[in-house]
Amino acid sequence: MRKILRFGVIGLSMWGSLLASGLAQTATPVASVAAVDLTRYSGKWFEIASFPMFFQRQCVANTTAEYQANNSGGIRVVNRCATEKGVDEAVGVATVVPGFGNSRLKVSFFWPFSGDYWILGLDPEYRFAVVGSPNRKYLWILSRTPQLPAPLLDAALAAAQAQGFDLKELRYTSQKTN
């Protein structure tokens, strides 16, 4: 009986430790970078990798995003990708969430619905950006060029991992050049 009780206490203790460590990892909030210069951030970005998403299911290659300030104070967003049937394009508007140095945006492709667009990692030279959501369901690695050199890709992946993103779901995007 003592043996059973001792193993039961050890088992409960181990289970409690595992539960607490799992909660501690997932409870750490995602943080966006301190500041983003939206003028430098504007322009064309190539998707290097992303989590699979329903709204990108038809994309087979050449996924890009373009950002440009518009006259109403927002940011025009144009997402494009190659599909089996040609090119798919989605046009939306992003607005800055005040108080976060332009690193948190709300993006809407279909009013009144919007999603979180948080810049979680940003190369000092703006060569790559790590973008995700605070619930860790969305993640993109973006680059100014169709291919991201290995050291920069490693830095981008490290930034995502530091925010608690599980990179097992990450899918790399084919950027075919003609």
Q: What residue ranges belong to the model's regions?
A:
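A beta-rich soluble binding module of mature secreted/lumenal proteins
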Residues: 2-178
